[in-house]
From Swiss-Prot:
Residues 235-249, 294-312 have a biased composition (Low complexity). InterPro entries: HD, HD_metazoa, Homeobox_CS, Homeodomain-like_sf, HXA10/ABDB-like. Residues 336-395 bind DNA. Keywords: Developmental protein, DNA-binding, Homeobox, Nucleus, Transcription, Transcription regulation. Belongs to the Abd-B homeobox family. This is Homeobox protein Hox-A10. Disulfide bonds: none annotated.
């Protein structure tokens, strides 16, 4: 700074605005000229960095920033204030504050260069009036002190206008954007015959921006009404959309329509009285036994082998199947297999007695047993196979239990 001072102050013939003197008289003269220039005091302590000339004036910080295009960094740190041109609508003045009042040239502690870069002329978004003579300085009282806030003009133009920023979300409480979102949702919905989306009534109180890809279309809600008739559409009444009447719903595909018809037919078959196969006991008549034999054989021909655990508990299995199918027939996809008919108590008892005598049957003995319990040859063979597997499993568990009982794990 000493070299610069010696270069700038060789002679007393320089004007006052070109001096870098550290004397308090020169600085007070500069501060007085800044105060009398019409821009008012800076609001800082002791009439500090005054606002004047052609730069931006920040009322909340008391800082005057000269424009970087007209005032280079080396000159504004020394207090050289040339007359500014009328390129922008900025008043020309004999001096403008580069440092604080009463401070030396080296005390430019507010760091003007990064803020000047932020308010650079090509990057700034201040409105530029048409070229013309600069108006006289405005004579108005200084603005009242207010909390720090960014300049509104510097942030209003921060993005280019051709960037599609507003297409990614929609404030549902604005009336001009709601038809756009509703039309887009109607185009995106795979079933466009549903009711129109009522998206404008969603955010009337909150005003939260909802992304554009999260549009509430009726595709997922109405797809639940496949197996339940009008039940799916009635459940939508609690949501933001009006309930869709069952008659106006979309047409079911032929495969789904046939599947729903089969499900309804099976429900009616379940609600009907049980078949006589379950009712035939040890004291049934000959005619009832023949009907039971025919129905059970037909059911067994169409169904694969039943498991042994379900045969051992026919009452619990029948009750659980009837309740489970009535409760979950509209939740799960049903297979094409018919409902398995478990063996009756009489049939299970006869088969168990024969198994105690002989675990393996010949074909002649198997035919005799099948005639006595009114089952087919294949049913008896499968029952004996399952019973042997069950016995093998029980023997293995008992052996493991005996082995572990010999060890003390205390």
């Amino acid at each position: 700074m000493s070299a610069r001072k010696g270069y700038l102050l060789p002679s007393p013939n320089y004007p006052t605005t070109m001096s870098c003197s550290e004397s308090p008289a020169a600085n007070s003269f500069l501060v007085d000229s800044l105060i009398s220039s019409g821009r008012g005091e800076a609001g800082g302590g002791g009439g500090g960095a005054g606002g004047g000339g052609g730069g931006g004036y920040y009322a909340h910080g008391g800082v005057y920033l000269p424009p970087a295009a007209d005032l280079p960094y080396g000159l504004q740190s020394c207090g050289l204030f040339p007359t500014l041109g009328g390129k922008r609508n900025e008043a020309a003045s004999p001096g403008s504050g580069g440092g604080g009042g009463g401070l030396g040239p080296g005390a430019h502690g507010y760091g003007p260069s990064p803020i000047d870069l932020w308010l650079d002329a090509p990057r700034s978004c201040r409105m530029e009036p048409p070229d013309g003579p600069p108006p006289p300085p405005q004579q108005q009282p200084p603005p009242p002190p207010q909390p720090p806030q960014p300049a509104p003009q510097a942030t209003s133009c921060s993005f280019a206008q051709n960037i599609k920023e507003e297409s990614s979300y929609c404030l549902y409480d604005s009336a001009d954007k709601c038809p756009k979102v509703s039309a887009t949702a109607a185009e995106l919905a795979p079933f466009p015959r549903g009711p129109p989306p009522d998206g404008c009534a969603l955010g009337t109180s909150s005003g939260v921006p909802v992304p554009g890809y999260f549009r509430l279309s009726q595709a997922y809600g109405t797809a639940k009404g496949y197996g339940s008739g009008g039940g799916g559409a009635q459940q939508l009444g609690a949501g933001p959309f009006p309930a869709q009447p069952p008659g106006r719903g979309f047409d079911l595909p032929p495969a789904l329509a046939s599947g729903s018809a089969d499900a309804a037919r099976k429900e009616r078959a379940l609600d009907s009285p049980p078949p006589p196969t379950l009712a035939c006991g040890s004291g049934g008549g000959s005619q009832g036994d023949e009907e039971a034999h025919a129905s059970s054989s037909a059911a067994e021909e169409l169904s694969p082998a039943p498991s042994e655990s379900s045969k051992a508990s026919p009452e619990k299995d029948s009750l659980g199947n009837s309740k489970g199918e009535n409760a979950a027939n509209w939740l799960t996809a049903k297979s094409g297999r018919k409902k398995r008919c478990p063996y009756t108590k009489h049939q299970t008892l006869e088969l168990e007695k024969e198994f105690l005598f002989n675990m393996y049957l010949t074909r002649e003995r198997r035919l005799e047993i099948s005639r006595s319990v009114h089952l087919t040859d294949r049913q008896v063979k499968i029952w004996f196979q399952n019973r042997r597997m069950k016995l093998k499993k029980m023997n293995r568990e008992n052996r493991i239990r005996e082995l572990t009982a010999n060890f003390n794990f205390s």
